[in-house]
Amino acid sequence: MRAPLLLPLLPLLLFGVSSGNNDKTTHSTTVSPETTKQITTITVTTSQVQGSISASKPSSTAPTAVMSFTKAQEAATSSKQHDSSTSSIPPPSTSITPSIITTSPQGKTPSTPALTHTPDQNTKTTGRQDDTSHVSVASTSASQQVSSSASAAVPTTTSAVTSSATQQKVSPTDSSEILLKPSASPNSTQVTSPSRTPKGFLSTVTTSPHIADNGSTALNQLKSTVSSSEVPVSSFLDKDHSVSSSTSATNQHLSLSSHRPTSPVPKFECSTPHSGSVPSTSSKTSLSSPSSSTKNATVTTTMTTAKAAYTSQGDGSVTHKSGVTAQSPTSAPLPTPTLKDHMKSKSPDQTHSNVSPPNEVICEDQIGEVRPILNLKEEKTCDDWKKASNEAFFEVFCSGRRHAFNSTRDRCTVKLASSNHRRWAVHVIVHRVLDPAAVFEELKEKRNELEKLGITNVTYLNQEMEEEIKDQSSTPLIITIVTLAGSLLLIAAIYGCCHQRFSQKKSQQRLTEELQTMENGYHDNPTLEVMETGSEMQEKKVNLNGELGDSWIVPLDTIMKEDLEEEDTHL
């Protein structure tokens, strides 16, 4: 009851004592609870800060210890303990190497974590062992005040850490849990929850930080690697414990309060293996915790834990996931497999559909049908034929008159059958790939067949089939008709010219005869004169001949006829 009343006066007293102590010291706190409890030794070395320790009074069943460091104001409260407690304030140093060793007088060895942190970091560790659990809470802050109180009848250990904008609740399983939570200063946050391993194996945690500071606006990066190793220890008992950490802007009425409203704390998941022999796996956790100032901290943590899916202890149930990865916006994302990578990962047995299958020679024992027979000079077996089947061999058997065999495009199968090795029956099957342009031309000529199949049009390279295909027989018919017509016209022209010429000749001959008759003047009728001309000429000739013979011989009949004709003419 006296401890709460002395709290306002003790910070002033301890402030003077701590300001005078500037030498490098080592702070050691030894808490010895009852005979049924364990002895915890904590060694902490800090840099550029001054610390104050507030140790609460342990109860008969569960003690509670809270420790915090500040730069400006420090407070320390010491309460009554059952056995003894020794406290000392460490001075600044260049590195921090805290180690926590917990031993049990009852022959039970708990987990022994070893932590190493960088400068400008305040670490507060509370070690406690109630036969089954070990809770360690670390809080970093630029200005903190610590007040601790303990009740005499609290059955479990409860530690509350107040930061800003984050609330996290972790329920460990069997053996121990270490919770490190950052606040305003650029520090790292690590959570490791090792559970009870089979046959008393423990987990040892080692952290190797590295911080690079480049001024007020530089980036603070922290890379830590957590490795888990197995150490044989005695078995542990199962007991339910709960550690809750909540955020508040002003105060916390449990044990520890820290007011940093502008410093968000990242949330992450921890992995806890279930009891039993399970193989260990590796997982990576990357966190980014920005502070209220211009500094940022990036934490990369590699945790090696055992595979566990679900763990339930007592009243509280906790689901643990192994291999959980949390990434900050600044961390690089993991590469995801793409469709291209999936296509590259296919087996090389799969052949491309555009590649033609190889040519082959198939031998048969019996001749199924009438085939050409090859007579050989020497006997050959099927293996001899296959050895001789090169490109020239297939060009000889697979080439035709109209189409030459192309080994890169076409496929040829030669089947040989024989009962006698000197006589082979050959059967050739050629799978020929047609040229697309030739196929288009062939389809253009088969419009009617395509319409029967329901095909209306065929296009190739922006070319379409013609709407109407002309009849090939119509052109020769037209040519024949035109030729016959021309021939008839030519014959008609020739006939007309010849007929006109003959008619002109006849007319000229008649005119000539009439002119000759008129000149003679014998008769009025030119027709008669023409007819008489011949007889007269004959008579004259006769007369001439008669004159030569000195005789005039004139037949009487001729004279009588001439007289009659003259009479008729005159009439």
UniProtKB/Swiss-Prot annotation:
Residues 1-19 form the signal peptide. InterPro entries: CD34/Podocalyxin, PODXL. Keywords: Cell adhesion, Cell membrane, Cell projection, Glycoprotein, Membrane, Signal, Transmembrane, Transmembrane helix. It is a single-pass type I membrane protein. GO terms for cellular component: apical plasma membrane; cytoplasm; filopodium; lamellipodium; membrane raft; microvillus membrane; plasma membrane; ruffle. N- and O-linked glycosylated. Sialoglycoprotein. It is found in: Apical cell membrane; Cell projection, Microvillus; Membrane raft; Cell projection, Lamellipodium. Residues 20-476 are extracellular. Residues 106-126, 184-196, 203-215, 243-261, 313-324 have a biased composition (Polar residues). Residues 84-105, 134-168, 271-299 have a biased composition (Low complexity). Pfam families: CD34_antigen. The chain crosses the membrane at residues 477-497. Glycans are attached at residues 187, 214, 296, 406, 457. Expressed in thrombocytes, kidney podocytes, vascular endothelia and mono- and multipotent progenitors from the bone marrow (at protein level). One of its GO terms (biological process) is cell migration. The keyword Protein transport does not apply. Residues 339-349 have a biased composition (Basic and acidic residues). Residues 70-215, 239-299, 311-359 are annotated as: Disordered. Residues 498-571 are cytoplasmic. Belongs to the podocalyxin family. Involved in the regulation of both adhesion and cell morphology and cancer progression. Functions as an anti-adhesive molecule that maintains an open filtration pathway between neighboring foot processes in the podocyte by charge repulsion. Acts as a pro-adhesive molecule, enhancing the adherence of cells to immobilized ligands, increasing the rate of migration and cell-cell contacts in an integrin-dependent manner. Involved in the formation of a preapical plasma membrane subdomain to set up initial epithelial polarization and the apical lumen formation during renal tubulogenesis. Both the O-glycan-rich domain of the extracellular domain and the C-terminus PDZ-binding motif (DTHL) in the cytoplasmic tail harbor an apical sorting signal. The cytoplasmic domain is necessary for the apical membrane targeting and renal tubulogenesis. The large highly anionic extracellular domain allows to maintain open filtration pathways between neighboring podocyte foot processes. The cytoplasmic C-terminus PDZ-binding motif (DTHL) is essential for interaction with NHERF1 and for targeting NHERF1 to the apical cell membrane. The extracellular domain is necessary for microvillus formation. This is Podocalyxin. It comes from Gallus gallus (Chicken). The lineage of its organism: Eukaryota, Metazoa, Chordata, Craniata, Vertebrata.
